Amino acid sequence: MNKKTQLISLAVAIATTLILAGCEITPHKVQRVVTSGVLSGNDPAAAIESLAKERLRSYRNNPHQLITDIEDLRKALRDLRTVAEAIWGEEENTVPSEKKYVKYSDDFHAKAVIDFEQGLLTVATLHDSDDPAQTRQQLQAAIVRTLLTPADLTAVDIFTANEPKGSGKPFLRGQVVDHDKVVVEYEWRANRFAEYLVETKLRKRRAKENDVYEVQIALVDDHKELRKHQYSDYVIAAAKRYDLEPELIYAIIETESSFNPYAVSHANAYGLMQVVAATAGRDVFERIRKIPGQPTSQQLFNPAQNIDIGSAYLYILNTQYLKGVRNANSREYAIVSAYNGGAGNVLKTFSSNRNRAVEIINRRQPGTVYRDLTSSKHPLPESRRYLEKVMYFKQDY
């Protein structure tokens, strides 16, 4: 690894460790941590981890500091994009999103992108050496790593180029079959399939100053259904706990993330139900769990926690913010729209006066309420489309 790559990798590792720990990121703090680690001959990551734990303890005494640190998280995510751009180029600086899993490896010279909406896996490697055979080997290794990435989300850090820790059942188990139409689950089959892909499906293209070697793998046709079943126990439990229809929870998950547990967004929404920690997460902590603060990104990447918190927020919308809406169908339309754009914007669709808005909703038929919430009367175009999508997907469950 050259010096430039080492510095880039170190910078990302530092930022990521602080991100995942929920720490305030400042140039002074990073410099202090790195200098301390280097001068003492210790691993800087150990010092960073210690600093992160110290920061987490401070949240117990001052939970509002977490809001400030979320702003630092946004900056750190922008920095991560900058690092990807520095290595791959402006058109290739892919980062995780709501419906795309993105994992860099091999010092950020390899990446895997799973488009859960399109059902497509792409694995790519930069050809920045004089030996094409070496690049092909690196691509083959990246394919194997991706196919065998464990389902245990705590073993995978999507914000760094670190390899997944641990083993166990693959995250993509059942969703990828090899050239013999057999499910890829074990290392020997993953290696065999990766070798076949590199030999027969390799594509080459340009990115910045280097060639890119890549292969694409289509997920099986029922990949969404398979992912749905992985989380069915959590959905059913949450539905019972919060008096919700399982079909509604499934439809929201499909709309928000296409069942991508690693989903992240520019609005700091995480996981399957795209929970925003500072708003929905804080509401659930304070109103349901009766504790201060808000969930961490680690909690929201946990499928069980994410589904519980997202469902609890639906419960809050249903029993508190929009409880005045009497018709069950109208209230469902209202809470779905509010899950995306807030209860305030739902009510503004009908009147600037909240009490008056509820009265208007109660006088209207559910179909009219739906049309109003999906029309230009609602202040947010995204929320209009969101309600349409959720109700469309709900029919499939």
Model-derived features: positions:
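A short, structured beta-strand-centered segment in the mid-to-C-terminal lobe
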Residues: 295-306
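Cell-wall glycan-active module
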Residues: 2, 22-251, 325, 352-376, ...
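Short, functionally critical alpha-helical segments immediately adjacent to catalytic or ligand/cofactor-binding
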Residues: 236, 243-264, 274-276, 310-311, ...
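Short, solvent-exposed loop/turn and secondary-structure capping segments
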Residues: 262-265, 285-287, 348-352
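Substrate-binding/active-site groove segments that recognize
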Residues: 266-293, 308-316, 364, 390
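Acidic helix/loop microenvironments that form the catalytic cleft of cell-wall polysaccharide enzymes
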Residues: 253-258, 306, 313, 324-355, ...
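Bacterial N-terminal signal peptides
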Residues: 11-19
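Bacterial N-terminal signal peptides that target proteins for export
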Residues: 2-10
